[in-house]
């Protein structure tokens, strides 16, 4: 998404699915972490939450972070505190979480265009974080540092609970002989979720 907004991608690190990454970002070199950090003006850290603190501090210990460099992570549960080792070396910490379920395919670009992003950053650079969210295609929503855990809990509830309930429902339908339980429930679940989202978006009635 950022490439489409005019950003030049200087490199990506090797991950769990290099083939898929190459398909989505053709021609972008795969480099080691230190080399990506050395070349980039904006570093995006999209790693599991448990790995983020060690990654940030490890790069700091190797002297990788640069003054004025933008460092953005996409973890829903953490704000900018986890980026303190980078900030102490002059980097600008940003936390931007696009509220979509990533597939690792071009479908993600379409989802981003209709999505929102939770944004946390120091007040002086909050407009930068908001602008990057917009360039991804998202509408930015500011989340306070102290509220990131509650935000992550809300996101986890919406995604994991939905998967669990649908899994239970499809299993019961399959047990009674429904051959395509996912297809059977598709329209019902989508319309129910859309109705619930509309109800949640409506302003409360005046008393």
What are these regions (language model features)?
Residues 9-15, 71-74, 119:
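Short, hydrophobic beta-strand segments that form beta-sheet elements in well-ordered domains
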Residues 23-25, 29-107:
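Rossmann-like NAD(P)(H) cofactor-binding subdomain of soluble oxidoreductases
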Residues 14, 98, 145:
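Active-site donor-binding loop signature of nucleotide-sugar glycosyltransferases
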Residues 200-207:
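C-terminal active-site/capping subdomain that shapes the small-molecule cofactor and substrate pocket
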Residues 1-38:
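NAD(P)+-binding Rossmann beta1-loop-alpha1 motif at the extreme N-terminus of oxidoreductases
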């Amino acid at each position: 998404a950022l490439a489409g907004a005019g950003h030049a991608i200087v490199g990506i690190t090797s991950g769990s699915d290099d083939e898929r990454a190459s398909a989505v970002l053709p021609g972008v070199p795969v480099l080691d972490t230190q080399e990506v950090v050395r070349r980039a003006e904006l570093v995006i850290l999209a790693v599991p939450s448990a790995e983020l603190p060690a990654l940030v501090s490890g790069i700091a210990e190797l002297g990788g972070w640069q003054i004025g460099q933008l460092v953005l992570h996409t973890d829903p549960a953490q704000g900018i505190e986890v980026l303190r080792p980078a900030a102490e070396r002059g980097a600008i910490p940003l936390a931007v979480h696009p509220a979509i379920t990533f597939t690792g395919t071009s479908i993600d670009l379409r989802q981003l265009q209709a999505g929102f992003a939770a944004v946390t950053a120091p007040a002086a650079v909050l407009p930068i974080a908001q602008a990057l969210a917009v360039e991804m295609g998202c509408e930015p929503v500011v989340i306070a540092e102290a509220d990131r855990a509650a935000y992550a809990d809300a996101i986890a509830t919406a995604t994991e609970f939905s998967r669990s309930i649908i899994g239970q429902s499809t299993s019961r339908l399959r047990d009674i002989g429904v051959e395509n339980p996912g297809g059977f429930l598709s329209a019902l679940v989508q319309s129910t979720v859309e109705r619930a989202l509309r109800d949640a978006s409506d302003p409360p009635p005046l008393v």
